[in-house]
Every structure is written in C-alpha cells, then in structure tokens.
Amino acid sequence: MQQVAIIGSGNIGTDLLIKIKRRSESLSVAAMVGIDPESDGLARARRLGVATTSDGVAGLLAMPEFEQAGIVLDATSANAHRANAAALAPYGRRLIDLTPAALGPFVVPAVNLDEHLSAPNVNMTTCGGQATVPIVAAISRVTPVAYAEIVATVASKSAGPGTRANIDEFTETTAHALESVGGARRGKAIIILNPAEPPLIMRDTVLCLVGDVDRDAVTESIHRMIADVAAYVPGYRLKQDVQFTPVDPAEMRILLPDDTVDVRWKVSVFLEVEGAAHYLPAYAGNLDIMTSAAVRVAERIAGAEVTA
C-alpha cells in the first residue's frame, strides 16, 4: 500500500481524500495538509483517522507521517505549488500537480500516462483538458487534426474563486494540451460558467477539422477512448452520436496554421461528465474528472514502483 500526502484541504483535496479512502486498493492517505485549521477538509481527515497539519508544506515536512508518503498530490494553487515543489525537491517525493503551475509534463491517463510514469512532477492539465484531450487524441490517431476547438460548460456553482481567477490560464493550458497531448496542429479552448439553477452537469463539445477521413474508423476510435476514460471516470459519456459535417476549405483557412493541407470535414463530439458525488455534488463533473484522473495517476505510479 503506497502512502500519499494531500496538500490542499479545499474541495479538490477533500474529494481526493474521500476517493482514496473509499475506493483505492493501492493507496492510503498518510497526511492531509492545509492552511486553515477550521477547514472542513482537515476536520473530515481527522474524523477518518488521517494525520493533519494547518501549517502548509512546512508542517508536512515536520510530520512523522511524511517519511512514509512517497507521493504528494498538490491541490492548492499555481503559486503555492511552485513553492511546495521547491520545498519538497530535496526529499525526492513524486508530485502530482492539480494546479495550473505545469512544472512537469501534462498527463491525461487514457492518452499518455505510460510515457511519464517516472517523471518527478506531473501536471493534470485542466478539467476541460482531462475531458476533451482524449477525444482529440482518439481522432488524431486515425487522421491528422488540423484544428481542435473545445467548449467546456460547467455549473457556475462548481467554479470557486480560484477557478474564476485562473480563467485565462485555463484556456491557455487547455489549448496547449490539445496540441501537445491531443495531437492537434492548433488548439483553442473556451470555458462557460453556466449560472442555471438547478446546476447542470458538465458538458463538453469537441470540434476537430480534418481532411478526407474514414468516418467509421474515427467513430470506433472515439468509442474506444470513451471506454478508456470511463474506466476511471464512470460518469464520462458520449451525449450524442459523433457527427461529420462537410466544410468549405477556403472558409476554414483562417483557423489553420499556414502549412496545413485543406480540411474537408468537421468532426463534432458532445460529451457529458457526471461526478461520482463522493464529496462534491454530482453536477461538479469538472472537479470529479480532475480528482479521478489524479488518483489513477497515483495508483499507476505506485504500481510501477512496486514492479520496478
């Protein structure tokens, strides 16, 4: 059983705690770290018998439980993660970063986890990236994707101050991941915070421009990828049939890199991500997919270390 520490006692950190305690067969939480001694996350951790500190990463380093924690999951903020990574660097811990800091490579478990199992610090990109990069990758393994555009629509209630403050970073990081992990020549990301009441489940739209293509092969690849993601995010599903729409290459040229061949088809994929409601509400699929992906990464890293 691999011991882990969680830094951040907010919604994300607390959901990580509950997920690992309830369903992980290979991970155990050694310590929960926060900066607010009155936070609900630290209180829940204490009730579950997990050691806690409200003194941040300095408090973690002083805890006897730190010696057993080989993996640290950081659910704080980009600036805090940079400081935490520097403080933890001398101790050789494996870091899983759920912030926009992106000090290490982007990891989307269904796409590229095997490539980064030995990386000292991996970044979970964004909720939109975790939901949509797999679809772009599924299409690009069949045919080149000249342009990928995603629209992530999340319940406004699920977006806290940190998410709102990092909207620009969200779009930039997600677009980068569409290219560097998904394989698109050019990526664009848009996020919508939907204020509807009652809150709606996360929806994601993926639009890809491609050349002449085998529709059956693309559709089959997308369905395989959705099954791969649903293995660790059970609420991840296709909302409608995959759609193929012919496009005018001349009209699309403005969206494409200069050296891209003409595109012929727009592939449209419509997704829904329902949360598991372990700690967060079911509509917060945007948060659940991040924590579920991070737990999968931690479990795979732990398994790789056991077999090494």
Curated annotation (Swiss-Prot):
Q: Which SUPFAM superfamilies match?
A: Glyceraldehyde-3-phosphate dehydrogenase-like, C-terminal domain, NAD(P)-binding Rossmann-fold domains
Which EC class, in a word? oxidoreductase
* InterPro entries in the cross-refs: Acetaldehyde_dehydrogenase, Acetylaldehyde_DH_C, NAD(P)-bd_dom_sf, Semialdehyde_DH_NAD-bd
State a single Gene Ontology molecular function: NAD binding
This protein's UniProt keywords: Aromatic hydrocarbons catabolism, NAD, Oxidoreductase
Which reactions are catalysed by this chain? acetaldehyde + NAD(+) + CoA = acetyl-CoA + NADH + H(+)
> In the UniProt entry, which residues are flagged as the active site?
127 (acyl-thioester intermediate)
Specify the superkingdom: Bacteria
Tell me yes or no: is NAD among this UniProt entry's keywords. Answer: yes
**HAMAP family according to UniProt:** Ac_ald_DH_ac (MF_01657)
Family (UniProt): Belongs to the acetaldehyde dehydrogenase family.
Its name, as the record gives it, is Acetaldehyde dehydrogenase 2
| Provenance organism | Parafrankia sp. (strain EAN1pec)
The uppermost taxa in this organism's lineage are:
Bacteria, Bacillati, Actinomycetota, Actinomycetes, Frankiales
